[in-house]
Every structure is written in C-alpha cells, then in structure tokens.
C-alpha cells in the first residue's frame, strides 16, 4: 500500500462516513498493479478490516475504463455487496460508470456460461478487457465455478482481485488454486508439497516456499487492524497450548453413549456421530440418525427422564443436562454474564433440535416463537434466542438486522444467536460480548472467520470492554491433562484422547503450518511511497476535506491550513485554489462535529458548513411515468 497516503491522515477521525486511510492506500496499490500492469492481486486483509468496501471502491474507479465482474458465494452476500455498493457511491468523490459493474452469485455466473454442463466458449469473449473480483476466494475453487475462472484467465488474459481473510482453508493444498489463478506458469503441486499420513501433516516444502515467493512477489496486499481498534479477548478455561479450553466433563449417561458411538465410528474425525455426541446425546444411534421417524413418535422414551412427542423434547434431562456437559456448563455460566452471546455449533443431525428445547426448558424464549418455562427477563423484555442454519438463509438478513440494531446492544431483543457454518461467511455481528464454540472448528480459517464475524472494526462502541471467548471441549470424567506442547503426544496417543481434544490438536497442527505460510505472505506484501495515483487524487482530496471540516465549521476561503493540505496533493497554487472554489461552489458534503451532516457554502470571504435535513411526507411516493411528467400519490 502507499505509505505516503497513510501519512496524510494522522489523527484520522473514523466515526463519520468516510473511506479509511488504509483503504485509500490499498486502492492506490490496486490501481497501479491491476489497472496499470494487468497483474492479479491477492487482497489478504484480516477479517473486519473492510475488504468489501475496498473492492467496491476499486470497481467504481476502474468502471470508467473496463467492465468489472464481481463473484460472491451466494445470494445473501450478493445482497450485502449490492447494499455496500450504494454506500461506496456515496463515499467516492470521482466519476464512475455503474452500468459497467456486474455482481453475480457463483451459481448464477456458472449458469450464464454453461449449457448442459458444457462451457459456452463462444460467449466468453465478452469478458475480454475486463477485471474480475472474487469474494471469499479461498472457497470458490475446487468446483465448476473455479474451473470456469481458470478457463477465463487462460482464454481472456484478465486480471483477478482475490479477496480473502484466510487464503488457506484447511491445508496448503487449498492455496494452490489461488497461486494458479495468479500465475501464467505451470506448477506441479506434488513438487512443492510434503504429504504426510494425516491431513495436518501436509506442509509446504522449501521449493514450495520459493515458488510462493516468486509467483506472488508484488501481488499481495496484507493488512491487519491495530489492537487499539478492537476489544481485547479473554479466553476462559484451562491452559491449552497457546490458548485456553473449557473442559466439560461428561456425566455417566453421556459418557456411556459417547464411548459406544466412538467404538462404532470409522475415520471418526469426519464422522457426524462423534460431532453429535460431543454436543449432546439423544439416545441410541439408530434413533438419532432417523429423526424423520423420531419426529412422528408419540411419547417415545430416549432416556428415563427424556422423551420425544411429535418432534418435541421434554423431561427433566433438559434442565439436569446429563445429556450434554457442554450445555450444562453453558446454562450454568450465562446467568452470570451480561451482553449478547454468539454461539457456534456444527449443524449435524440433531444440534438445532436439542438447543431449542434446552433453551426453552431453562427459561429462555425463542425469538418470534415459543416462550420459555418460567421465562427469564432483561429490562422488562424476554431473554430470547435464535438458531441460524443454512435452511433459513432467506430470513437471515432480517434476523441480523434485529440482532445488530442499537436497541439490542445488550440483548434486549435477541440475547443468544446460535449459528452453524453459515456465519463463517461475510456477515457482521455487533456488540457481541460472549463468543462460544460448542463445536471445535475443523480449520484455522473457520475458527478465525467465526471470531471475525464479531471482533471487527466498528462492531463495538466501546472497545475498552473485553470480549469473552469460550472454547468448549467434551472430555471424559477423569480427563484433566494439561497440554503445553504439540510434542506432548505421539500420533498413536492422540488417537486415544477425547474426540474434541484430538480435534483441537489436529487444528493446532494445521494452524502452525498455516501461520508459517501467512508470515511468508505478509512479508511479500508491498509497501511504497508515491504521490496518489492520478485516478485516486479526487478521492484522497475528498477524504482530506471531510477530515478538515469535521473540526472546522467556518474558515477563510484563503485559510492557510486548508490551502497547505490541498496543495500537498496538487503542488500547484492555481490547481489548489480552483479545487477549493469547486468544492465550495458544488456544496461538498461533510460531517461536522458540531453540526453533523452539512454542505459547504461560501459566505462573503469564508467557507462555512451548513447543516441540512432531508424531509419527506410519510407514505408519499413520486412516480416518474415519463421524463416530462411526475405524479405524486
């Protein structure tokens, strides 16, 4: 990124509508690399730092010269991008051609370019001289859409802007797709990878490191937020390597089922039954794996104190919680916590069902649903929960709007948000004070993305208050090992450990290699000093003016500080004076610390900020039937 641009914004105010300094500095780099030199870029910015806005601002700037195709994982994220594109158009202070920007979900883009599962090569010519932006780039490859991207790259020779906060999803092999899309060289990945017997033993060899450095040189933009911009994190539980883990010791009832299931499982790391029983037990496997039959049972006994009737769980076990050591710890703990909770769980066979009835029976009410037994309250409101799974994608945005609303800062509307892997995508959660992992994530990428949904810039009004993180592991009743090193156990020893502990160790092994490669990528990130790129000059000046008039309500039209600031970009007295006259005559929009939303006006020999409000009559619509006639109804 352009460090000279960063240094223009010392003491930057970021609590007003604005483009952040690091975003401007990155835009400069993207223009020089992608637009000027037709090179691809990996935008490796840690989650929560504003990759989406950077990509959309870049798309707007280059839309004057090229068509831009933006691919996102699904329709929900497409809606997020469309909404943010409107924000970007309000922020950017330059011309653009909005018709040249096309946003597609990967499924829609695939269907546009395939006929009967065969690529329509004749139609690909329309992508000549364009730029592709790929969101969640680490997830788009390894399928038909990824194959199509490779074809377009080879046929059309177009550059790609790849967005990723975690370019390695599981092992270094997943990075190979990103390398191939950014390179014209043929790469034999068997030459650069050391394959172990286990997934976590796959590592990049010395040749692989060399290939990485050569191919991605000058093609990486890395950025992470400063600690002062985020709340501190307090991990709870027992020391476990470089973190803490809560050991949730099983009751005899859960341990019996757990051991039986483990004996029956082959390749248990990928066995949904192990994930299920580490969360909660719901009777014999033949029942738990046949929920469609179980849901029609009448008063079916699962355990002496737990029954199911027409899909409804009831019985003392839902409050005693011998069926789940994790939920016993969770329910015992949340009564003493304040603020909103985000709870990640793997949506395996019966996770959502158990969660719902445990919460209801312990006094927590379902948002827009059933009221809990002896309902618990907060400030006169029910303490409520919501469960998010992939099946409810259509209503997720409405739910998150309520969860993130200022009126829910302390959980007055929704206190507990349970979510499966869908929340590892491009969503933002605000004011979350307690984060729970009911299921151990499979990868470092997944773990980071779940944390990154909440712990991000602008998600907290007060960053001085910490965020609590609870990583829960189901363990045997007599298990109390202190694990300080990955060398504490052999591979054979690891296989005898509780499933969650084994999964944690596998996660940490993969994390070690992932961090090594991320360090290499970070070192490849390019920083330089230069005057702003010509296509970004107006944008940089616009942000400087916004910052200046945040502090100043009235200045002389010949104000020395204003002149010096603008002239630092133009280095021309005549151009500087013309620019100051232009922003005044055009009534440039600013946010002032006293008058808030304002427009610039000239009053005699001064520039003043004039506050404004947009007024409208409720239920009044203006319909443009034709250019000459407007009708108000």
Curated annotation (Swiss-Prot):
EC number, UniProt record: 3.6.4.-
Cellular localisation: Virion
Coiled coil: none
GO MF, one annotated term: helicase activity
Enzyme class: hydrolase
Residue ranges occupied by any Helicase ATP-binding domain in the UniProt entry: 32-185
Keyword DNA-binding appears in the UniProt entry: yes
InterPro entries: DNA/RNA_helicase_DEAH_CS (IPR002464), Helicase/UvrB_N (IPR006935), Helicase_ATP-bd (IPR014001), Helicase_C-like (IPR001650), P-loop_NTPase (IPR027417)
Gene Ontology CC: one annotated term: virion component
Stretches assigned to the Helicase C-terminal domain: 326-505
Span(s) of short sequence motif DEXH box: 135-138
Binding-site residues for ATP, renumbered to this chain: 45-52
Subunit-structure text: Heterodimer of a 70 kDa and a 82 kDa subunit. Part of the early transcription complex composed of ETF, RAP94, and the DNA-directed RNA polymerase.
Role: Acts with RNA polymerase to initiate transcription from early gene promoters. Is recruited by the RPO-associated protein of 94 kDa (RAP94) to form the early transcription complex, which also contains the core RNA polymerase. ETF heterodimer binds to early gene promoters.
Family of this protein: Belongs to the helicase family. VETF subfamily.
Record protein name field: Early transcription factor 70 kDa subunit
The species this protein was found in: Fowlpox virus (strain NVSL) (FPV)
Gene assigned in the entry: VETFS
């Amino acid at each position: 990124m352009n460090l000279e641009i960063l240094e223009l914004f010392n003491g930057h105010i970021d609590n007003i509508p604005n483009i952040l300094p690091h975003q401007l500095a990155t835009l400069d780099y993207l223009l020089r690399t992608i637009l000027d030199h037709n090179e691809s870029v990996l935008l490796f910015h840690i989650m929560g730092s504003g990759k989406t806005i950077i990509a959309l601002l870049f798309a707007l700037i280059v839309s004057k010269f090229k068509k831009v195709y933006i691919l996102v994982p699904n329709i929900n994220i497409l809606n997020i991008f469309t909404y943010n594109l409107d924000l970007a158009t309000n922020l950017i202070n330059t011309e653009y051609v909005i018709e040249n920007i096309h946003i597609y979900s990967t499924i829609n883009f695939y269907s546009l370019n395939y006929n009967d599962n065969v690529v329509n090569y004749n139609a690909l010519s329309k992508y000549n001289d364009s730029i592709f932006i790929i969101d969640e780039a680490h997830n788009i490859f390894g399928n038909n859409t990824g194959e199509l991207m490779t074809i377009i790259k080879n046929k059309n020779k177009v550059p790609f802007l790849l967005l990723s906060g975690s370019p390695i999803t599981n092992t270094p092999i997943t990075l190979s797709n990103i390398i191939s899309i950014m390179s014209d060289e043929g790469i034999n990945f068997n030459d650069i990878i050391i394959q172990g017997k286990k997934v976590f033993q796959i590592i990049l060899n010395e040749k692989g490191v060399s290939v990485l450095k050569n191919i991605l040189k000058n093609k990486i933009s890395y950025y992470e937020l400063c600690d002062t911009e985020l709340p501190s994190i307090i991990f709870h539980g027992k020391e476990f390597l470089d973190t803490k883990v809560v050991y949730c010791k099983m009751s005899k009832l859960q341990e019996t089922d757990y051991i039986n299931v483990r004996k029956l499982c082959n390749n248990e790391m990928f066995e949904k039954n192990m994930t299920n029983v580490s969360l909660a037990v719901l009777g014999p496997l033949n029942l738990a794996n046949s929920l469609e039959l179980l849901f029609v049972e009448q008063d079916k006994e699962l355990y002496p104190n737990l029954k199911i009737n027409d899909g409804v769980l009831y019985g003392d076990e839902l409050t005693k919680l011998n069926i789940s050591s994790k939920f016993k710890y969770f329910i015992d703990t949340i009564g003493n916590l304040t603020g909103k909770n985000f709870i990640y769980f793997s949506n395996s066979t019966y996770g959502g069902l158990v969660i719902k009835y445990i919460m209801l029976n312990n006094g927590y009410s379902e948002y827009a649903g059933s009221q809990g037994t002896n309902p618990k309250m907060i400030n006169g409101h029910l303490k409520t929960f919501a469960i998010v799974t992939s099946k409810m994608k259509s209503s997720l945005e409405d739910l998150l709007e309520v969860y993130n609303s200022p009126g829910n800062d302390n959980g007055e509307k929704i206190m507990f948000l349970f979510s499966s892997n869908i929340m590892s995508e491009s969503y933002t959660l605000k004011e979350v004070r307690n984060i729970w992992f009911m299921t151990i994530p499979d990868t470092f990428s997944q773990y980071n993305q779940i944390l990154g949904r909440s712990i991000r810039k602008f998600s907290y009004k007060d960053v001085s208050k910490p965020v609590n993180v609870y990583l829960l592991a189901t363990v045997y009743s007599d298990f109390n090992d202190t694990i300080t090193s990955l060398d504490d156990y052999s591979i054979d020893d690891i296989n005898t450990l509780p499933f969650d502990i084994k999964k944690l160790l596998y996660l940490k092994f993969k994390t070690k290699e992932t961090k090594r490669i991320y360090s290499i990528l970070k070192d490849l990130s390019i920083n330089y000093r230069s005057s702003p790129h010509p296509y970004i000059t107006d944008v940089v000046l616009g942000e400087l003016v916004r910052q200046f008039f945040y502090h100043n309500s009235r200045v002389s039209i010949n104000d020395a500080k204003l002149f010096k600031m603008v002239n630092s970009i133009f280095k021309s007295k005549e151009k500087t004076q013309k620019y100051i006259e232009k922003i005044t005559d055009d009534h440039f929009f600013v946010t002032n610390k006293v008058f808030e939303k304002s427009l610039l006006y000239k009053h005699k020999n001064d520039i003043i900020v004039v506050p404004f409000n947009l007024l409208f009559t409720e239920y009044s619509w203006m319909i443009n039937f034709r250019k000459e006639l407007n009708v108000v109804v």
